[in-house]
Regions:
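Non-catalytic terminal and connector segments of soluble metabolic enzymes
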Residues: 1-135
Length: 135
């Protein structure tokens, strides 16, 4: 089924000039960019995005990280996009990420892992509404 999903190239990926490399990974796997914007996440958006982590010991570090500098928000579209993107990204921790995945290639840590992607079709819809209210 054709799906849409959100990918965030996090501040560490933007700071390291990896936007083009990362987008190529998705496009080379048949996914299409349908929306893209470079933006600085506000604390309000970051807190909504990471609301499931509120109260956890890493929450403030996560909010500070995602709001420190611009990120690149993208909507990708393609066949089984949600699962395919997560496979292309690899495991959250670079030490667990399979060879050839974005996180294996570019991530520095579990937090500075370059990318976020929607984990379900439902969360993709919610994240599109959050990050792309104009769409």
């Amino acid at each position: 089924m054709i799906e849409k999903s959100v990918v965030l190239i996090k501040p560490d990926g933007v700071e390291r000039n990896l936007i083009g490399n990362i987008i190529s990974c998705y496009e080379d796997n048949g996914l299409k960019v349908v929306e893209l914007k470079l933006m600085k996440a506000t604390r309000e958006i970051a807190e909504k995005h990471y609301c499931q982590h509120k109260g956890k010991d890493f929450y403030e570090e996560l909010i500070t990280f995602i709001t420190r500098s611009p990120l690149c928000a993208i909507i990708l579209k393609g066949e089984d996009a949600v699962a395919r993107i997560r496979s292309i990204n690899g495991a959250t921790s670079p030490t667990d990420a399979a060879e050839g995945t974005i996180r294996h290639r570019y991530a520095r840590s579990k937090t500075e892992n370059c990318v976020h992607a929607s984990d379900t079709v439902e969360s993709a819809k919610e994240e599109i509404a959050l990050w792309f209210p104009e769409v």
